[in-house]
Each structure stands twice: as C-alpha cells, then as structure tokens.
C-alpha cells in the first residue's frame, strides 16, 4: 500500500470539492461576514470571550487543535485567532454534515467544511488530505481539528485520535494547541438553549512536524 504522501502526489479530487479551491461566491462571503459580526457581538455581550496567547499563532497555514465541548467552539476559535471566519475550515463528519444537500448548502454559507469519514480507511483519508491541501493552498488559510473526534459532556478531555498529527506531518504544517474553557457550561451537548456565561480560549505554542 502506498504511503499517504505517495498517494497524494497524483491524486485528483472530484468536482464536489471545487468549492474549497475557489473564492466563495458573493452570497457566501456576505453570510460569513454577517455570521462573524453576529458572533463578535454575541461573545462580547451574552457569553463574554477572553483570549490568551493570540500572539503565539504562526503564519498561515496551521492546524488549530482544541478540546471540543460545544457547537459554539469553532466560532470561539476563529474569533480567538482574529483572522476572519473565511480563513478557516473545519473537519466535519461526512455522514452527518454532507448527507443532506440542503444542510450542506446552508452550513457552507456560514463556515468552510471539509468532509471526513468517521470510519477510517486509507482511501478516504487520502481524499480528506487532498481536500485539506487544496483549501490550505488557496490564500492564507488554516484548519480547525478536534482530536477527540466528538464533544465532551462535562468538559473533561477525552482520548486523542491520530488524525491531526498525520495531517501535520503529511502536509508539513504546524499544530497550534488550544484549550476552550467554559463552553460546555454555556451550550452543553444535547441542549438547545444557550446559557449566559464567560468563555475563554487559551492558545499555546505551535508544534512543528519536524520537531
């Protein structure tokens, strides 16, 4: 079996991934900007956000790798980075976020999503790496990955999957560790309503794949 790097050399993505390699249409840019402004106001007034360590972020591209407690986590991380919502993509479960055309269209208006199969296979992971590479090569863009693979119920850290480390090594980009504090109290897994409360994002030192 070929290594991931060998498989990537001549890998061609299907047309369904074209959205990752081009500038979003005007409607998408407007929706992302409106969503970003809404989030800025929301996390200033209702769930005040504190940011620690933003100056540690390296030049793009990089992988922002964080614990995962809530559906609000991606917005928190993008705001903490401060480079704009369109400069990030999130890894998203293919069987949930991409199995419905309406859901896929709606969510991609607000954020960039890269599909990945929950069940690992060499072929599906090569496809994911190729899609990620295309996105990261288009302007100053970065990736958000949650190494636990799911949201925590109580804020406790779960076991890590190896995916983020493989992406960093195969694409030659650093991992920036981050820790989100408080989001599991504001919007816990399984709840519809968001509770008011403070949240904080701690950003750590980047880790380079050759270190």
Predicted regions and their residues:
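A transmembrane-helix-recognition feature enriched in membrane-embedded lipid enzymes
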Residues: 3-52, 100-113
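Serine/threonine-rich low-complexity intrinsically disordered regions
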Residues: 1-3, 24-25, 121, 208-209
């Amino acid at each position: 079996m070929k290594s991931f790097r060998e498989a990537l050399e001549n890998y061609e993505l299907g047309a369904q991934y074209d959205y990752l390699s081009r500038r979003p249409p005007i409607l998408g840019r407007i929706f992302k900007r409106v969503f970003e402004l809404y989030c800025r106001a929301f996390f200033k007034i209702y769930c005040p956000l504190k940011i620690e360590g933003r100056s540690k972020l390296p030049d793009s591209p990089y992988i922002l790798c964080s614990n995962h407690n809530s559906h609000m986590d991606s917005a928190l991380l993008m705001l903490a980075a401060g480079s704009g919502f369109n400069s990030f993509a999130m890894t998203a479960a293919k069987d949930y976020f991409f199995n419905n055309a309406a859901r896929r269209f709606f969510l991609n208006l607000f954020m960039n999503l890269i599909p990945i199969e929950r069940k690992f296979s060499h072929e599906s992971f090569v496809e994911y790496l190729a899609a990620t590479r295309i996105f990261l090569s288009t302007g100053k863009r970065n990736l958000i990955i949650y190494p636990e693979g799911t949201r925590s119920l109580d804020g406790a850290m779960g076991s890590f999957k190896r995916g983020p480390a493989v992406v960093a090594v195969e694409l030659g980009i650093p991992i920036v560790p981050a820790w989100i504090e408080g989001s599991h109290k504001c919007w816990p897994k399984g709840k519809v309503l968001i509770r008011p409360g403070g949240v904080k994002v701690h950003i750590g030192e980047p880790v380079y794949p050759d270190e």
